[in-house]
Amino acid sequence: MGEAEKFHYIYSCDLDINVQLKIGSLEGKREQKSYKAVLEDPMLKFSGLYQETCSDLYVTCQVFAEGKPLALPVRTSYKAFSTRWNWNEWLKLPVKYPDLPRNAQVALTIWDVYGPGSAVPVGGTTVSLFGKYGMFRQGMHDLKVWPNVEADGSEPTRTPGRTSSTLSEDQMSRLAKLTKAHRQGHMVKVDWLDRLTFREIEMINESEKRSSNFMYLMVEFRCVKCDDKEYGIVYYEKDGDESSPILTSFELVKVPDPQMSMENLVESKHHKLARSLRSGPSDHDLKPNATTRDQLNIIVSYPPTKQLTYEEQDLVWKFRYYLTNQEKALTKFLKCVNWDLPQEAKQALELLGKWKPMDVEDSLELLSSHYTNPTVRRYAVARLRQADDEDLLMYLLQLVQALKYENFDDIKNGLEPTKKDSQTSASESLSNSGVSSGDIDSSQIITNPLPPVASPPPASKAKEVSDGENLEQDLCTFLISRACKNSTLANYLYWYVIVECEDQDTQQRDPKTHEMYLNVMRRFSQALLKGDKSVRVMRSLLAAQQTFVDRLVHLMKAVQRESGNRKKKNERLQALLGDNEKMNLSDVELIPLPLEPQVKIRGIIPETATLFKSALMPAQLFFKTEDGGKYPVIFKHGDDLRQDQLILQIISLMDKLLRKENLDLKLTPYKVLATSTKHGFMQFIQSVPVAEVLDTEGSIQNFFRKYAPSETGPYGISAEVMDTYVKSCAGYCVITYILGVGDRHLDNLLLTKTGKLFHIDFGYILGRDPKPLPPPMKLNKEMVEGMGGTQSEQYQEFRKQCYTAFLHLRRYSNLILNLFSLMVDANIPDIALEPDKTVKKVQDKFRLDLSDEEAVHYMQSLIDESVHALFAAVVEQIHKFAQYWRK
């Protein structure tokens, strides 16, 4: 092989010098702007575009790879031009050959002066530094310039310099390739012919450039020569072909931090200086300016879940004396206190007595797990003493849960020592029996009956317990003392605590909490035994209730064991209820109904008892009341009703809050009571599922016209019934949205003949739903048509009621959030899934970040989204078919 046929090359990684690039000339004409552009931007008239001679252009050059710059740009030096742009200048780029990646490209932008201190791009072009075979470019290249844009260094680039979009560019590209082949020795060199050929090539290129609408920038890349031999630069990376291990799975590496969990000395020093006792006298008379006052008002208005920043805590502490006149600010102040510092805690407790008394509903926050100081918790109990029995009953379920955050030793120490007493000779409390806690049946604590009595004492005549006026009561003592004064409170306190005592999950997971509830029940039993005759009657009636429920559970188990179909089980149920010798349920001494103790019952009517069509077959029972009437209930065995009990309690509370604002939305908060983790009572409301209404009557309006016709009312329906329907729809739409009630279909929406619509079956709450893509609220086409359609007056009234209800409930959001915060450790299925997110889920539904006006617009969007939810309609049809095939 001859010397001329050899290919000489050098690796790019071995050439440790900077890349150089020569900027040659710029060919082509710049297109002038239109007169309209000059009128809109008069500065154009003074730019280089309108100079008589060639304007003073300059070129910047920058290397890119993968869309990122590898170095700073460099530019040509100043040069004055007369007839053509010709820099003829070598630029030394701040990048060396070994540092160039395979996909490196150089971006060239031509700039023109545009006013003082500014420039505009004439055009840009980009070219890769390595060819498709990995050879570094050499020699001269004519690059197409894209007008009025900067060179694009991304990959792929939007300003390619080497392109063949037209026939003329194809011709120039073909000639450039032939020139390159001649330079590399792939053609026979004939001097006289070469000179003629190159001259002709230059003429063709000049002609093509002139006829083209684009400008062309000529650049030249360095050629490497050694010993009169030309070398090509081949891209090569040392050790680039070696395989490198790739981790298919990551591994966490734990790096020990010696300062982790250690005290931050700077923060501690700042905290001590900010809370110094020396600043107390000066803080006493401190008043905030307007800006600070607004900031304090914002902090006070925060929801109870909001964590205060260190700056906000310091601000509240600084103006603590000023805030003592604001009852809403007390909880925020107590959050600022570091209770581990004795002096700071002492200051806070001294100020607690001087603070303006907080509202009863706000004091519930102080009973949550976040407040462990016993004085603070007893202050909350002292505020609860101001609540009447009706309000206390609304919070009782949560207050029983709040016992989990009390001092268990204090509750245990409240038990009286074991001793025989003449008053208890007929029935000793379990604590005197010597039975160990592990062998305790919680229902036996209070089911040792006294001699029977004719009727329970009126709540107003119950004698006050001696410690009832004690301002230092803990929560347990307070609840027991109030229950001893009111038979209704005693009824619900007993059943709420009984359920906690019988909770097997708590017994296994947290034995101390289980033991605490047993001690609460013992103390309750002792308090009832210590009272006068009327108080001891309460204990006797609670024991009778427990016996009655136990017999009913025994009966339901016997019915469930019965083989055969539902009809046969119904017959067995009625037969057992009628057998007074075995069950003694149809004729009993007068006792309060556990579900609603104001109702006194004499037994169950056997002939009317029936079982529902469902897997667990709950029983519908009719109780004989004291006045000879009937009270229908549903008794469920094998089902945990605590979640339904919570939701109905919150709905009942919301109904009371709305009525307080003179807004009666005709809600139906039927009563639910869990008497165990496996059984309980539900009030039965005579009603028809909406699905059945649509099947039998065709529409909701037809149903109303059948049972409440009126010639003068809207659509031939009684105006009162239509008003009730519209209001109840609005109330439940807003409430079920806030509580995140899921699994809504027309079988668990019920309708009464008086127009009340209400929801049942709250197995999915807080955003959980077995169906995909549920709408924000259950509001389908059939329900809207029941109001007369989206254009009707009733539908507009429905929307108005939704807005009003939502705004009112937002104002009571703190109370509702406090109640849910006390339930986070309750064994309620949908809360136990994510207890730390429970309160946040409810808070998010209130949208407290919005103003009232914004909240109304937000509710509008929710209603519109729910009405037009197409997927929800499809799911409803699927559910309808599924129910059909089950039947």
Swiss-Prot record:
Assigned keywords, A-Z: ATP-binding, Autophagy, Cell cycle, Cell division, Cytoplasmic vesicle, Endosome, Kinase, Lipid metabolism, Manganese, Nucleotide-binding, Phosphoprotein, Transferase, Ubl conjugation
Principal location: other
Biased composition (Pro residues): 449-459
The record's account of how the chain is modified after translation: Ubiquitinated via 'Lys-29'- and 'Lys-48'-linked ubiquitination by UBE3C, promoting its degradation. Deubiquitination by ZRANB1/TRABID promotes its stabilization, leading to autophagosome maturation.
UniProt-listed GO biological process terms: autophagosome assembly; autophagosome maturation; autophagy; cell division; cellular response to glucose starvation; cellular response to starvation; early endosome to late endosome transport; endosome organization
Location of the PIK helical domain: 283-520
Residue numbers of Phosphothreonine PTMs: 163
SMART domains, alphabetized: PI3K_C2, PI3Ka, PI3Kc
Region feature Catalytic loop, mapped onto this chain: 740-748
Oligomer and partners: Component of the PI3K (PI3KC3/PI3K-III/class III phosphatidylinositol 3-kinase) complex the core of which is composed of the catalytic subunit PIK3C3, the regulatory subunit PIK3R4 and BECN1 associating with additional regulatory/auxiliary subunits to form alternative complex forms. Alternative complex forms containing a fourth regulatory subunit in a mutually exclusive manner are: the PI3K complex I (PI3KC3-C1) containing ATG14, and the PI3K complex II (PI3KC3-C2) containing UVRAG.
Protein's name according to its UniProt entry: Phosphatidylinositol 3-kinase catalytic subunit type 3
Organism: Mus musculus (Mouse)
Gene name linked to the record: Pik3c3
